[in-house]
Amino acid sequence: MGMENLLNYYFIMKKRFVTVLLACSLAGGLFAQQPWFKDKDLTLTGAYYYPEHWDESQWERDFKQMHDLGFEFTHFAEFAWAQLEPEEGKYDFSWLDKAVALAAKYDLKVIMCTSTATPPVWMSRKYPEILIKNENGTVLDHGARQHASFASPVYRELAYKMIEKLAQHYGNDSRIIGWQLDNEPAVQFDYNPKAELAFRDFLREKYHHDIKALNDAWGTAFWSEVYSSFDEITLPKTAQMFMNHHQILDYRRFAASQTNDFLNEQCLLIKKYAKNQWVTTNYIPNYEEGHIGGSPADRKSVV
């Protein structure tokens, strides 16, 4: 190819390149004016916020920044039981009312959370029987979270009282779009005496009060594990070598049932007052199987 032909080829390709760039630019402008999805089809975005953790003077600044970043909602009261009920039976929602009002000022809807993952210290001290007991005998204590046993009737009663007060206060508030139950609920291997009694009741119901049916399901004829009464059954000792895996599996099912029942009762309480607010929960997907969830039928009221 001669020099003249080479120059002609260069200018032709340059014109084509500029034409393609111009076409792409026009197409980009066209698509920029026509969003792929309608706003109503997009997922809402929000952020957890803990007003009890921050000085009140910072709240408005933070909510404004959330709004400026495009967030549309926030979560409140996830771990705030001590602030909601500083003393047994004495409730204080005044600080939360201020936070809800400020969030609304910046067009942020609120997801209200039940604080059952973090019972206050007065409860642990006054009612130590609510605390989870590990297999090695260690009793969990105040200072972390999720240290209360779902099998404890006392803990449940106190939780339901607090939740009902919260639902009465915010159930008809249009600024509240929904509720989150607990936080990442899970059931540990809980050796609280109430858990063992509840496990036996779970087995009685599952096997229709027929101890032979349980023995057959668990294969207890092997190694002389046969039971003659449900009262002889204890919680499975996972540290013990060759523990009956059917017993462990039924314990996991029991744990899931306890979790579902606790969440279900919370939901029913809230729904008494929150007719136009949805209710859900959250969890970590890598929790051990059986500790969270269950079938959709188990959670039919959590909607």
Language model: regions and residue ranges:
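Short, solvent-exposed turn/loop segments enriched in Gly/Ser/Thr/Pro and often Arg
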Residues: 50-52, 77-80, 113-122, 177-186, ...
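Short, well-ordered coil/turn segments that N-cap beta-strands
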Residues: 40-43, 70-72, 104-110, 172-177, ...
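Bacterial N-terminal signal peptides
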Residues: 19-29
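An acidic-aromatic substrate-binding cleft motif
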Residues: 34-58, 64-72
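Bacterial N-terminal signal peptides that target proteins for export
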Residues: 6, 10-20
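Polysaccharide-binding and catalytic clefts of secreted carbohydrate-active enzymes
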Residues: 136, 140-298
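Conserved small/polar residues in nucleotide/adenosyl-binding loops
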Residues: 302-303
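Aromatic-lined substrate-binding rim segments of carbohydrate-active enzymes
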Residues: 60-140, 164-167, 265-273
